[in-house]
């Protein structure tokens, strides 16, 4: 019985989780927090940095608690301080609105910290906050896929990397959306403490880290889909049911509000949209199917419509790369 108890206690010791370093000489990462920040954008990297033995300080402009995009309340360690000496600064994404982007105090603090910090890294659409300071001008950057066009439009002096999960400009680093912050954090650990330490951390948190690959949202098949104009006035989008796939196949599902007598209106609109985008009709005459050659690769899009009531129907879009 004593032997069993000893083994049990040993297992408990092995399972203990240590907090981040409190050593003043440890590599020091500051994490910007703001109202509406996306939790995974900073919690994931904090876990990585803590496991790597870094010291971490979370900061908000006034030191007050913030509420994340998912409703989690987080109290930072402190308010902004010009005296704080950081080795790296992490800028997460989330509800990045005009109020935040136009906040002079936030922008000036980031620029001030960037002068002494060895590294500055944005996660997800935190790239907008970083780009707004001018620190990304002339550099390559990435962000969450759904913000690509907006980012490119708003920051023409920044080269957008649509096919990267992580960009490394030496001092300035950016990552794609959400969980990509973990990849960026591991890459920063590799720069500071070496690849072996970074891989050890990845193993400890049971994360399949692929520094030069993995799931890259900007490479997924839906990148070739055209952008549709507004729906006809008698058709209403009720819900987006699903949206998933990989590099060769993509599926989208929608529910539309449309009277049974006007079903043909949606089919006609789809045909017009695809034709305007340069796609060619494929299959039978009445089939909702089109093909297109994109960078010497043939893609086929098929749409199936199914009426669920007199006033609603579902649409399933299937995009496939042809071999």
Q: Where on the chain are the PLM-derived regions?
A:
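Bacterial N-terminal signal peptides
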Residues: 4-14
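Extended, subdomain-level signal for the structured scaffold at the beginning of enzyme domains
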Residues: 19-120, 128-133, 162, 186-323
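Residues that mark the start of a beta-strand
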Residues: 26-30, 140, 171
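A short beta-strand/loop micro-motif in the catalytic core of glycosyltransferases
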Residues: 120-121, 141
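A conserved active-site-flanking secondary-structure segment within enzyme catalytic domains
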Residues: 136-165, 204
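Amphipathic alpha-helical segments enriched in hydrophobic/aromatic residues interleaved with Lys/Arg
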Residues: 163-176
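Active-site-proximal catalytic alpha-helix in oxidoreductases
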Residues: 173-186
């Amino acid at each position: 019985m004593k032997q069993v108890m000893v083994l049990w206690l040993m297992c408990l010791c092995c399972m203990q989780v240590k907090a981040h370093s409190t050593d003043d000489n440890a590599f020091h990462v500051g994490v910007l927090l703001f109202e509406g920040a996306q939790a995974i954008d900073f919690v994931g990297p904090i876990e990585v940095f803590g496991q790597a033995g870094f010291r971490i300080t979370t900061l908000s402009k006034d030191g007050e608690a913030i509420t994340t995009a998912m409703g989690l309340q987080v109290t930072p360690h402190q308010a902004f301080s010009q005296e704080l000496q950081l080795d790296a600064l992490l800028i997460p994404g989330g509800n990045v609105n005009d109020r935040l982007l136009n906040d002079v105090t936030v922008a000036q603090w980031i620029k001030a910290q960037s002068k002494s910090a060895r590294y500055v890294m944005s996660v997800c659409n935190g790239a907008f906050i970083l780009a707004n300071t001018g620190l990304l001008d002339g550099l390559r950057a990435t962000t969450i896929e759904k913000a690509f066009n907006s980012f490119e439009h708003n920051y023409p002096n920044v080269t957008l990397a649509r096919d990267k999960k992580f960009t490394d400009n030496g001092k300035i680093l950016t990552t794609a959306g959400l969980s990509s912050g973990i990849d960026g954090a591991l890459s920063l650990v590799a720069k500071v403490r070496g690849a072996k330490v970074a891989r050890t951390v990845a193993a400890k948190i049971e994360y399949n880290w692929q520094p030069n690959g993995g799931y890259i949202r900007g490479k997924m098949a839906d990148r070739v889909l055209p952008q549709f104009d507004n729906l006809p006035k008698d058709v209403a989008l009720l819900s987006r049911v699903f949206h998933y796939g990989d590099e060769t196949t993509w599926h989208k599902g929608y529910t539309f509000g449309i009277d049974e007598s006007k079903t043909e209106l949606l089919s006609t609109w789809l045909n017009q949209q695809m034709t305007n985008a340069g796609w060619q009709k494929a299959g039978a005459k009445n089939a909702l199917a089109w093909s297109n050659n994109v960078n010497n690769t043939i893609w086929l899009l098929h749409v199936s419509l199914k009426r669920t009531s007199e006033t609603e129907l579902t649409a399933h879009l299937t995009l496939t790369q042809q071999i």
